[in-house]
Amino acid sequence: MYDIKTFNAIAPVGLARFNEENFTINKTETPAGIILRSEKLHDYAFPASVLAVARAGAGTNNVPVKQCTEDGIVVFNTPGANANAVKELVIACLLLSVRPILKGSNWVQTLTGTDTEEQAEAQKKQFAGTELEGKKLGVIGLGAIGAMVANDAYRLGMEVTGFDPFVSVDTAWSISRRVKRAQSMEEVLKTCDFITVHVPLSENTHHLIGKEQLAQMKNNAVLLNFARGELVETEAVIEALAQGEISNFVTDFADERLLHNEKILVLPHLGASTEEAEVNCAKMAARTLKKFLETGNIKRSVNFPTVEMAFNSPFRFTIVHRNVPNMLGQISTGIANLDINIDTMINRSRDDYAYTIVDIAETDEAKINAAAEKIQAAENIIRVRTIKNAEAVSY
């Protein structure tokens, strides 16, 4: 039985994925898994029981990923589950950036008298805008969201250029061939009328858009940030707007320094705030966490490699270890020395860590436990789990 601890309100349809036969929700102080949205876990004391954390959303900067990795805790996210919601908001804000819709609507609310229609017609010219068709959009980051923004902007008649040196094969196939691929971020900054940023936050992308990058942009360019606030250097943007280096800034991340500036549109982090996105993220997070706890298979992890193998044997070892030479030999020898036969084995690595799954043709739990203890005691081993396949075990 696995207990799942929740932070924030998780959509019930997602939690329903955890069947009552194998899972409980918030019943103990020693959960096997954690599922959350925006709760910050950097000061959270993780119980030793925690095997995995599933973030119902794309970003994981609210989770101490490095600490989790060192402790053998797998961290999952839900890439693409909220992509459509964010994409729609980006498209809406592209339109808002060229058409003063909000100003016009607010102005109409101030009209008095019985001739409001005549007043509106007489003054509407002050709210004239421009069109997106034919304008150039630069998309920095072509993940699930960036790819969708690029495709839909092209359908609106924009000339779209994308830049992402690490675009995945799957995403690359989904991007319209009409979207031009830039060879550098500088190319995007210098040539586009609108720049929208869609990259994850990391040490390498912190202040990805700063003073130097803003100086490269057109002086009538509009910058949009719906990824993470820290990707854009706030003070540099304010200065660039004041000096006329760029035209406008649209962001989904509130900062008191950005308020009360007519050149800046600030939203209260609405990107994924749709009913559909909340449900999609909860379902994906629950599904991924459930599969990992029941089988040890890893998919959509931000700190460990994708490792999946059909579970047909009576028992399975999953082993988190350092990515150093001779680990597989050490593991397999330790198992074989106890007269346990290995059915199948798979190993994948990611940076300094690796993950190994070993399926064994053994049902003697005393021998299995002894093997697990022996593996755990070996050098460079971080965590060992033993998973019983109820459907395969027959006594």
Task: List the model feature ranges, each with a label.
Residues 1-78, 210-212, 233, 345, ...:
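An N-terminal-biased, well-structured beta-alpha scaffold segment characteristic
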Residues 42-44, 165-258, 273:
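Rossmann-like adenosine-cofactor binding region
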Residues 79-136, 300-302:
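Phosphate-binding beta-alpha-beta segment of Rossmann-like dinucleotide-binding domains, i.e.
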Residues 87-106, 151-158, 284-297, 332-336, ...:
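Oxidoreductase and adenylate-handling cofactor-binding alpha/beta cores
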Residues 142-143:
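Glycine-rich Rossmann-fold phosphate-binding loop(s) that bind the pyrophosphate
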Residues 146-147:
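N-terminal Rossmann-fold NAD(P) dinucleotide-binding loop
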Residues 161, 219-311, 338, 355-362, ...:
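Rossmann-like dinucleotide-binding domain for NAD(H)/NADP(H)
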Residues 299, 303-395:
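A conserved regulatory-domain signal marking ACT and ACT-like small-molecule sensing domains
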